[in-house]
Amino acid sequence: MRQRTIVCPLIQNDGCYLLCKMADNRGVFPGQWALSGGGVEPGERIEEALRREIREELGEQLILSDITPWTFRDDIRIKTYADGRQEEIYMIYLIFDCVSANRDICINDEFQDYAWVKPEELALYDLNVATRHTLALKGLL
């Protein structure tokens, strides 16, 4: 089984949290709402990976004014690729508290939508199990 270290930002701006809706046909949680993030590449430092993933998935215009390591966790997930292949992966999640200075987002094709959500409205979204766990641990659900 392949192992991946995943950097995952919990991004907050003006009291709201950023959720991204995964594409329907791929990823670990197709069609569900999630936090952004992705894998650390060989030789890459953790914060470099976090900033790269944010640029790739959310665009160059989003400005983070604060990044603080928060927690970690692990689990085993099935990843679905765009061609329909599936793979079981041992995932190690490194989760960061992030504050953005703006809300200027340009999502890539991994996502179909995004939303800035008030804490009291987070439970109304079809959150994947990993995001639900993270938000509950943070006291937001």
Swiss-Prot record:
Family designation: Belongs to the Nudix hydrolase family. NudI subfamily.
Any one cellular-component term (Gene Ontology): cytoplasm
GO MF annotation, one: dCTP diphosphatase activity
Assembly description: Monomer.
HAMAP family (UniProt xref): Nudix_NudI
Cofactor: Mg(2+)
Keywords attached to this entry: Hydrolase, Magnesium
Protein name: Nucleoside triphosphatase NudI
EC number: 3.6.1.9, 3.6.1.12, 3.6.1.-, 3.6.1.23
